[in-house]
């Protein structure tokens, strides 16, 4: 998957409203296998397989399918010690039959022993602060005393320290992944079911890691409601700035659903923060096959100018001035050129807005008179051809410029 040069990185606050280029928040580089998150690197795309990790063959095939279509980091669920040990076989088989793929293990309830085992077989371990040291809620509880709060905090440190030291020794990373729906009971009593509670959950684990000299951390604060996800991540950035922290953020909307709305919901959350310069890696969570998440990720990044991995199409919405069937022609142009990378192609229905709106495009396809198409290279009109030859001649123009590759 080709990626063009990344946008400028700045330690300043998000760009002013007049800026046309997104200025990303400066973050520390965090390794996940051969991929680096943060540190000015392009925003990383990741997803998670659906297969049971005990199914070695199925898991390897699923990881490979995702990686082959551009998923740069793949997460797997590890709910038991047997699953943790299975990761050794999965990793070995990937190396033997395909290639190394950056792998993340997802560890949840009281997961110290599981995490310690799987840390030997993956590149990153994701833990959920609300579940890593799980205290069963008491139905009759009305408050947490400071002593009770601190007692659990000490237990968290005791349980987290061995994992931190293992990852530190192996030069591997950790994701502190907070979910709005699984905040620890003591956080709920102290901060409420709020973005503040999510941020404080993350900070508690970050402070423990820092006290042990461990900084290979990425942070995520996810929620199924977009406004909560936005507020939590913005507050996390504010608090990290106040504390002098520069950890990269993993963005996502949990339980976004499926279909058009699931994609819109994910884009509303992820895209909004990326536009503010916040975010170093993303996952679009859909109730569909994981492979369907990857194109959405790359489309969000391309729309924001953060990564260019496909053709950028500029096309007008059509109106009474349009001189050809715009929808049909756009479909033909897209089908003929969608395998290319790094080009901007404009398909405009008339001369009124065509040349101006497509001024930044590499190539233009414009209806200037009935039955004929004008082809442009940048702002220059190159030739006028019969409409039925338009797509073919556009391809010939791209080929003549040496920018065509066969699909």
Curated annotation (Swiss-Prot):
It is an enzyme of class 1 (oxidoreductase). Converts 2C-methyl-D-erythritol 2,4-cyclodiphosphate (ME-2,4cPP) into 1-hydroxy-2-methyl-2-(E)-butenyl 4-diphosphate. InterPro entries: Dihydropteroate_synth-like_sf, IspG_bac, IspG_bac-typ, NO2/SO3_Rdtase_4Fe4S_sf. Pathway: Isoprenoid biosynthesis; isopentenyl diphosphate biosynthesis via DXP pathway; isopentenyl diphosphate from 1-deoxy-D-xylulose 5-phosphate: step 5/6. Its cofactor is [4Fe-4S] cluster. GO terms for molecular function: 4 iron, 4 sulfur cluster binding; 4-hydroxy-3-methylbut-2-en-1-yl diphosphate synthase activity (ferredoxin); iron ion binding. [4Fe-4S] cluster binds at residues 316, 319, 350, 357. The keyword tRNA processing does not apply. It comes from the Bacteria. Belongs to the IspG family. Binds 1 [4Fe-4S] cluster. NCBIfam families: ispG_gcpE (TIGR00612), PRK00366.1 (NF001540). The keyword Oxidoreductase applies. Keywords: 4Fe-4S, Iron, Iron-sulfur, Isoprene biosynthesis, Metal-binding, Oxidoreductase. SUPFAM superfamilies: Nitrite and sulphite reductase 4Fe-4S domain-like. It catalyses: (2E)-4-hydroxy-3-methylbut-2-enyl diphosphate + 2 oxidized [2Fe-2S]-[ferredoxin] + H2O = 2-C-methyl-D-erythritol 2,4-cyclic diphosphate + 2 reduced [2Fe-2S]-[ferredoxin] + H(+). Its EC number is 1.17.7.1. This is 4-hydroxy-3-methylbut-2-en-1-yl diphosphate synthase (ferredoxin). One of its GO terms (biological process) is isopentenyl diphosphate biosynthetic process, methylerythritol 4-phosphate pathway. Pfam families: GcpE.
């Amino acid at each position: 998957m080709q990626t063009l040069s990344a946008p400028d990185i700045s330690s300043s606050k998000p760009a002013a409203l007049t800026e046309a280029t997104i200025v990303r928040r400066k973050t520390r580089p965090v390794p996940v296998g051969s991929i680096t998150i943060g540190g000015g690197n392009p925003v990383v795309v990741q997803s998670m397989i659906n297969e049971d990790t005990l199914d070695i063959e199925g898991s390897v095939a699923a990881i490979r399918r995702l990686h082959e279509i551009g998923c740069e980091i793949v997460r797997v669920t590890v709910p038991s010690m047997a699953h943790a040990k299975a990761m050794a076989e999965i990793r070995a088989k990937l190396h033997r039959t395909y290639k190394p793929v950056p792998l993340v293990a997802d560890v949840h309830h009281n997961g110290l022993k599981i995490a310690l085992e799987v840390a030997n077989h993956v590149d990153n371990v994701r833990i959920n602060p609300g579940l890593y040291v799980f205290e069963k809620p008491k139905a009759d509880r009305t408050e947490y005393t400071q002593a009770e709060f601190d007692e659990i905090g000490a237990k968290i440190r005791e349980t987290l320290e061995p994992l931190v030291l293992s990852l530190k020794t192996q030069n591997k990373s950790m994701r502190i992944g907070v979910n709005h729906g699984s905040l620890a009971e003591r956080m709920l009593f102290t901060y409420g079911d709020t973005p503040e509670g999510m941020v404080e959950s993350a900070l508690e684990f970050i402070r423990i890691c820092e006290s042990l000299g461990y900084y290979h951390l990425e942070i995520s604060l996810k929620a199924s409601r977009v406004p909560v996800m936005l507020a939590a991540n913005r507050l996390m950035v504010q608090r990290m700035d106040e504390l002098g922290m520069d950890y990269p953020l993993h963005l996502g909307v949990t339980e976004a659903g499926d279909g058009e709305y699931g994609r819109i919901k994910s884009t509303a959350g992820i895209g909004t923060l990326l536009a503010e310069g916040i975010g170093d890696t993303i996952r679009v969570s859909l109730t569909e096959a994981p492979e369907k998440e990857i194109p959405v990720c790359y489309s969000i990044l391309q729309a924001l100018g953060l990564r260019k991995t496909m053709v950028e199409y500029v096309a007008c919405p059509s109106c009474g001035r349009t001189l050809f069937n715009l929808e049909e022609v756009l479909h033909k142009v897209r089908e003929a050129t969608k395998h290319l990378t790094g080009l901007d192609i404009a398909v405009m229905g008339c001369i009124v807005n065509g040349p101006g709106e497509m001024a930044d495009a590499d190539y233009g396809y414009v209806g200037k008179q009935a039955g004929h198409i004008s082809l442009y290279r940048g702002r220059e009109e190159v030739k006028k051809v019969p409409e039925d030859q338009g797509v073919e001649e556009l391809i010939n123009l791209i080929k003549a410029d040496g920018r065509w590759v066969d699909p």
